[in-house]
Amino acid sequence: MLKFAKFRRECVAEFRRVVWPARTQVHTAVKVVLVSTVVMALFLGLIDALFVALLSFFF
């Protein structure tokens, strides 16, 4: 039990030292990730459709 208490105290101390990002930074990062994901999904979907069309042309 003593080890757990020490671990918990160290975790709390570490969380107090963390510099958390501002809300606007988080929103910007989320937007970048979402846009990047959608763009990549569209790109991969287009490549997949091209491969399907190309392979159906030969087979």
Curated annotation (Swiss-Prot):
It is found in: Cell inner membrane. It is a single-pass membrane protein. One of its GO terms (biological process) is protein transport by the Sec complex. One of its GO terms (molecular function) is protein transmembrane transporter activity. Signal peptide: none annotated. It comes from the Bacteria. GO terms for cellular component: plasma membrane. Its main location: membrane. Keywords: Cell inner membrane, Cell membrane, Membrane, Protein transport, Translocation, Transmembrane, Transmembrane helix, Transport. The chain crosses the membrane at residues 39-59. The keyword Oxidoreductase does not apply. Belongs to the SecE/SEC61-gamma family. PANTHER family: PROTEIN TRANSLOCASE SUBUNIT SECE. Component of the Sec protein translocase complex. Heterotrimer consisting of SecY, SecE and SecG subunits. The heterotrimers can form oligomers, although 1 heterotrimer is thought to be able to translocate proteins. Interacts with the ribosome. Interacts with SecDF, and other proteins may be involved. Interacts with SecA. Essential subunit of the Sec protein translocation channel SecYEG. Clamps together the 2 halves of SecY. May contact the channel plug during translocation. This is Protein translocase subunit SecE. It comes from Treponema pallidum (strain Nichols). The gene is secE.
